[in-house]
A protein has these predicted regions:
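Bacterial Sec-dependent N-terminal signal peptides
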Residues: 1-23, 226
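General N-terminal leader/first-domain-start detector
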Residues: 3, 18-77
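Intrinsic-disorder/low-complexity, polar/charged segments
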Residues: 24-27, 32, 190, 218-222
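Aromatic-patch recognition
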Residues: 60, 65-192
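Long, compositionally biased interface segments
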Residues: 196-235
Length: 235
C-alpha cells in the first residue's frame, strides 16, 4: 500500500512540474521570458534550404521584441524575428533554440539594438479586422488621426540554372501602403492619392507634395511625410 502511495505522489509531482501557469493579472508589462511559459514549437528550416537570395523575414537579424496577445496580454520577449511569408514570430528559448510562438498575437514591436529604431507591426486578424484587406502583419509607418501602414508581400521563386541539377530559390519582396482614416482602411498606390483620401486638408497636402517632389524623395518617403504632415495640421 505504501508503495502505491509513493508512486501516486511521484506521478502527481511530475504532472505538476510539467505544467506552467501564467498569472494573467501579473503578466502585463513584466517578465522577459513569458513566451517560454506559453510555449511554442521548434522551427525546422526545410522550406528554404536552397535559398540563394532574399529572406522570408522582415529583417534577418534578431531584435528585441514586445507583443500583445489576442487576449490583450502584454508579453516581453528577449530576442525575436518576424517571418512575413508565413506570418509567424520566431524567438530563441533559454537554450537558444529557434522556436515559433504558439499563441495568436495582436501586435508586436521589434527594436534594433544597434540603431535603437523600433518597428510596430499590427496583425490584421486581431489588431484591426477589415474583410477586404489581406491578412497578415502591417508595419505602422505613421500614426495619428490618419495612420499609414506598410504591407510586405514575399514571393518565392524557383529557378534551375543552365546545366545544373539543383533548383535555386529566390524570395522577392513587394510592398503595398494603406491609410487608416475615419475607420476606413484604403490602399494608396502613389503620393498623389493622399490629398484625395485626406481631402479635408487637400490644398495644404498638394502644396507640401510639390516640395517633396522637388526634393526627389522616394514614393515611400513621400507617403510617410504626407501622412505625418497631415497629422501635424490637426494638432
Amino acid at each position: 500500500m505504501k508503495l502505491y502511495l509513493c508512486i501516486a505522489c511521484c506521478l502527481l509531482s511530475l504532472i505538476s512540474s510539467s505544467q506552467k501557469v501564467v498569472d494573467v493579472d501579473k503578466t502585463s508589462g513584466t517578465a522577459g521570458n513569458l513566451f517560454y511559459a506559453v510555449g511554442g514549437e521548434p522551427y525546422v528550416n526545410v522550406k528554404f534550404v536552397r535559398l540563394v537570395s532574399g529572406s522570408p523575414y522582415f529583417k534577418d537579424q534578431w531584435m528585441k521584441g514586445a507583443a500583445t496577445s489576442a487576449a490583450g496580454i502584454l508579453f516581453k520577449s528577449g530576442i525575436v524575428k518576424l517571418d512575413i511569408m508565413d506570418n509567424e514570430v520566431h524567438f530563441l528559448d533559454v537554450a537558444e533554440k529557434e522556436m515559433i510562438v504558439g499563441l495568436p498575437l495582436k501586435d508586436i514591436t521589434l527594436t534594433d539594438t544597434l540603431t535603437g529604431k523600433s518597428y510596430h507591426f499590427v496583425n490584421t486578424t486581431y489588431g484591426f479586422n477589415y474583410p477586404s484587406v489581406k491578412k497578415g502583419w502591417y508595419l505602422q509607418a505613421a500614426s495619428g488621426a490618419a495612420g499609414l501602414y506598410q504591407y510586405f508581400i514575399k514571393q518565392l521563386r524557383e529557378n534551375r540554372p543552365f546545366n545544373s541539377a539543383t533548383t535555386e530559390q529566390t524570395i522577392v519582396t513587394l510592398e503595398e501602403f494603406y491609410i487608416l482614416y475615419k475607420s476606413n482602411l484604403v490602399r494608396v498606390k502613389k503620393p498623389k492619392d493622399v490629398p484625395l483620401i485626406l481631402s479635408d486638408k487637400k490644398a495644404e497636402l498638394e502644396v507640401y507634395l510639390k516640395k517633396l517632389d522637388a526634393q526627389k524623395a522616394s514614393n515611400s518617403e513621400q507617403l510617410v511625410a504626407l501622412v505625418t504632415y497631415y497629422n501635424s495640421l490637426l494638432e
